[in-house]
């Protein structure tokens, strides 16, 4: 997928990118590839793959959650890595207010430089573990309209990291690959324990490669119990599962 095909593929979903936005994506690609030579940000570095599997893929939540397109939502991106999905969403929909949390300082430094070079405003970054960022004494707890995560962990783990950040009436959006149906079944208990309810599981395929993808949308129905998230590392080692 080259930049023109990227533009056309999004236009099919009624997302129209301006020349400025396309230039921002082009610069994003250059900065990503250049920095990746210094330390590992991604294994995907060829332009067609970056545009498809990073940029296009990051924008797919807007296909199924229309409010992302025109509402000034506050979004927390948990474990954003090289900025996915939040930076592509911010480029395409500038009204979004983005907060990024990542545990590796090198990635945060890259993101700070990226935001400056792209001329983006309304983006904050935090070097922190998701477990402490969403802790019971954190000012960020239950303060965001949306929490997003892409390929960070299984849904049973992700929900413990993300749902405590989402305000009542807000949503968690998980971007998943082929095994999402199994994850959804396994993760339902954790989602419910954390005050959420799975309301959408949208299955689709990426253009060109037909790689399977899922967008899972979870509504925040009630407060997350203060005992969650547990201490750093525990959610991954001991995911919340239904008692046998």
Curated annotation (Swiss-Prot):
Q: Where is this region: Disordered?
A: 221-244
One Pfam family hit: GidB
Q: Which UniProt keywords apply?
A: Cytoplasm, Methyltransferase, rRNA processing, S-adenosyl-L-methionine, Transferase
Which InterPro entries does the record cross-reference, listed alphabetically?
rRNA_ssu_MeTfrase_G, SAM-dependent_MTases_sf
Q: Which SUPFAM superfamilies match?
A: S-adenosyl-L-methionine-dependent methyltransferases
EC number, as in UniProt: 2.1.1.-
Q: What Gene Ontology cellular-component terms does the record carry? A: cytosol
Give the main localization category: cytoplasm
The protein's location, in the record's own words, is: Cytoplasm
Q: Which GO terms describe its molecular function?
A: rRNA (guanine-N7-)-methyltransferase activity
| Primary role | Specifically methylates the N7 position of a guanine in 16S rRNA.
Could you say which protein family the record assigns here?
Answer: Belongs to the methyltransferase superfamily. RNA methyltransferase RsmG family.
This one is known as: Ribosomal RNA small subunit methyltransferase G
Please give the organism.
Lactiplantibacillus plantarum (strain ATCC BAA-793 / NCIMB 8826 / WCFS1)
Q: What is the lineage of its organism?
A: Bacteria, Bacillati, Bacillota, Bacilli, Lactobacillales
Gene that encodes the chain: rsmG
